[in-house]
């Protein structure tokens, strides 16, 4: 916790200049809105630790603005707003996600999809033969409705693996 907000550390660097005091250069990412912040901490500065717990939840369905998840151990269902879910565009029914809780307040901080997911292409323009010399890409729509850039050889009905953090195509799945 820094300045009353929750962050996680993305990167840090211990700096010991020739003159002056040692300090830490830290890149923090807000859990609430995903914004990054770079800050310089003196070695004497202290931050409040926040205990978090990761639990496996299965996505069931969408109801209005809420995404309904079920705890796989006790079958408790919880609603989450789409803003709290990383990679929400690639979420499909039955996917198992990690939901991160603040253990002191039992509130949901965010939910993460697996890093890679397999989705079926529901629509894409047919690729033209002979256009394989370059790394040409085209738009495709996957079963969740998200749009992804794919190579020309991908056709409607193919299953593809997508990196949920970046939204990029990684490979075709047979």
Labelled PLM ranges:
Residues 1-143, 147-174:
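Acidic-enriched and Gly/Ser
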């Amino acid at each position: 916790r820094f300045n009353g907000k929750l962050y996680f550390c993305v990167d840090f660097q211990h700096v010991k200049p020739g003159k002056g005091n040692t300090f830490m250069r830290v890149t923090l990412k807000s859990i609430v809105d995903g914004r990054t912040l770079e800050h310089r901490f003196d070695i004497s500065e202290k931050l409040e630790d926040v205990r978090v717990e990761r639990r496996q939840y299965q996505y069931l369905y969408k109801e209005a603005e809420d995404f309904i998840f079920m705890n796989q151990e006790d079958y408790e269902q919880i609603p989450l707003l789409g803003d709290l879910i990383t990679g929400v565009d690639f979420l499909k029914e039955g996917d198992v996600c990690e939901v991160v809780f603040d253990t002191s307040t039992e509130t949901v901080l965010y939910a993460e999809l697996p890093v890679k997911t397999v989705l079926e292409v529901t629509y894409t323009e047919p690729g033209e033969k002979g256009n394989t010399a370059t790394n040409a890409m085209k738009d495709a729509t996957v079963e969740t409705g998200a749009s992804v850039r794919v190579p020309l050889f991908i056709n409607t009905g193919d299953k593809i693996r997508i990196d949920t953090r970046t939204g990029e195509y990684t490979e075709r799945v047979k």
